[in-house]
């Protein structure tokens, strides 16, 4: 390994020779990042991306000014999907170093899992990886059940079974119980539900290649809520939380579901399929039914659900939907504390009624007359949350993954959202 490049911080502007807007400069001692007090974390992250682009793979963060947040900002920009990198971290006290180490372990797990090729990460592998992560932080308090294939149909998990039956890799439901109380009858404080589509071709409503090439990341919601639970545990979560991951491939075959099919759910709802590429909501519905049955104070679902959310917010913000204004405010406050970008989008009672079907109670996609696709998708999900007006948050994970590098991120997964959800769980 080469000698580490030293990275220091300064509140002084760079020498004029580097230009008026220089964020870093190079000298015989290493690289200096020049902070301006406006968005120091963002500046550090962007500078780290540039340093990685120079081919520097071994750095030492040294000198005054390096704390947990600045160290983490550097790593967010420095980490990439190819090759290895080594960072010698600054001196931190034990508590702060533990916080940094937990971020490195858990959020890197989220990023690496989302970046994994679909060939390596099928529905069952995703569920098992989630179990392994959570057992690594709290195995004594974790129990779980994996239901897959025809067992899903027999137990009436019809959304998940319908979407996943077209693949040779069986669909899977992971139901995991984190119960630190030791009381098997303890109330469930929160349920987390994640969309785990390990590859989304669109089914018979097939995607073009330009929209399919990143669909290994369509399990980003499942990875995010798994990481959030693990991270909350490391921060001292002492309440019972259940995790439901709805994992499947959405592929084309002679056994794949088709337009016009009607899915009959356990809560009595019937859904006509008019777009097989609107499959995420169909699998989440099963998880939300189970979550509602637990009568928790809080239900959070996370999913890379709609292109409409990305159209509205790009890849820079996660979209938040809720009927519960107070709860939405709490999540946005958690996001602000963790310096993670969330933006609330509209969800009103009328969005629940913008999914008309001629043959069933609901359609799985809105018609051209109702173009607010992210809001109607959230409205669809609300039909599977028993008390949807209170205690439920839906996160459309538009900031989970980037197809191409930008100035602050490499291509691939970001890990954004993990800390915010963990913060809310432990508040």
UniProtKB/Swiss-Prot annotation:
Catalytic activity: Release of an N-terminal amino acid, Xaa, from a peptide or arylamide. Xaa is preferably Glu or Asp but may be other amino acids, including Leu, Met, His, Cys and Gln
Family matches, as Pfam families: DUF3663, Peptidase_M17
Molecular function in Gene Ontology: manganese ion binding; metalloaminopeptidase activity
Residues annotated for Mn(2+) 2 binding in this entry: 195, 200, 218, 279
Class of this enzyme: hydrolase
Active-site residues, record numbering mapped to chain: 207, 281
EC number: 3.4.11.23
GO process annotations (BP): proteolysis
Keywords from the named record: Aminopeptidase, Cytoplasm, Hydrolase, Manganese, Metal-binding, Protease
Binding site for Mn(2+) 1: 200, 277, 279
SUPFAM superfamilies in the cross-refs: Zn-dependent exopeptidases (SSF53187)
Cofactor: Mn(2+)
Protein location: Cytoplasm
Record InterPro entries: Leucine_aapep/pepB, M17_PepB-like_N, Pept_M17_PepB, Peptidase_M17_C
Domain of life assignment: Bacteria
GO cellular component: cytoplasm
Co-factor binding comment: Binds 2 manganese ions per subunit.
Family of the protein in this entry: Belongs to the peptidase M17 family.
Subunit-structure text: Homohexamer.
Function noted in UniProt: Probably plays an important role in intracellular peptide degradation.
Name of this protein: Peptidase B
């Amino acid at each position: 390994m080469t000698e580490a490049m030293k990275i220091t911080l300064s509140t002084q502007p760079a020498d004029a020779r580097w230009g008026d807007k220089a964020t870093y400069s190079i000298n015989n001692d290493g690289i200096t990042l020049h902070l301006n007090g406006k968005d120091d974390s963002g500046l550090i992250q962007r500078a780290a991306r540039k340093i990685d682009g120079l081919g520097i793979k071994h750095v030492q963060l040294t000198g005054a000014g390096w704390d947990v947040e600045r160290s983490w900002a550097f790593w967010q920009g420095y980490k990439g999907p190819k090759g290895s990198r080594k960072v010698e971290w600054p001196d931190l006290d034990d508590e702060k170093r533990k916080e940094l180490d937990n971020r490195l372990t858990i959020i890197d797990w989220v990023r690496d899992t989302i970046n994994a090729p679909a060939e390596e990460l099928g529905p069952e592998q995703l569920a098992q990886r989630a179990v392994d992560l959570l057992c690594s932080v709290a195995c004594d308090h974790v129990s779980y059940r994996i239901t897959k294939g025809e067992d899903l149909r027999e137990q009436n998990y019809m959304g998940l079974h319908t979407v996943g039956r077209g693949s040779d890799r069986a669909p899977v439901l992971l139901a995991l119980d984190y119960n630190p109380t030791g009381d098997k009858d303890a109330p469930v404080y929160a349920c987390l539900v994640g969309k785990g589509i390990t590859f989304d071709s669109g089914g018979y409503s097939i995607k073009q290649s330009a929209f399919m090439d990143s669909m290994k990341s369509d399990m980003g919601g499942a990875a995010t809520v798994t990481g959030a639970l693990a991270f909350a545990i490391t921060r001292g979560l002492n309440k019972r939380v259940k995790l439901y991951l709805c994992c499947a491939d959405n592929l084309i075959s002679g056994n794949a579901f088709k337009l016009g099919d009607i899915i009959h759910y356990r809560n009595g709802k019937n859904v006509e399929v008019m777009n097989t590429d609107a499959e995420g909501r169909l699998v989440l519905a099963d998880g939300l039914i189970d979550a509602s049955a637990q009568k928790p104070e809080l239900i959070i679902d996370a999913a890379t659900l709609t292109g409409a959310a990305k159209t509205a917010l790009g890849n820079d913000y996660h979209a938040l939907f809720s009927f519960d204004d107070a709860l939405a405010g709490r999540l946005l406050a958690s996001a602000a504390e963790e310096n993670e970008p969330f933006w609330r989008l509209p969800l009103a009672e009328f969005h629940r009624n913008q999914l008309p079907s001629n043959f069933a109670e609901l359609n799985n996609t809105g018609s051209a007359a109702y173009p607010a696709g992210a809001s109607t998708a959230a409205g669809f999900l609300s039909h599977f949350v028993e008390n949807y007006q209170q205690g439920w948050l839906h996160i459309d994970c538009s900031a989970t993954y980037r197809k191409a590098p930008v100035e602050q991120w490499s291509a691939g997964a970001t890990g954004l959202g993990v800390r915010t959800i963990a913060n809310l769980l432990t508040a």
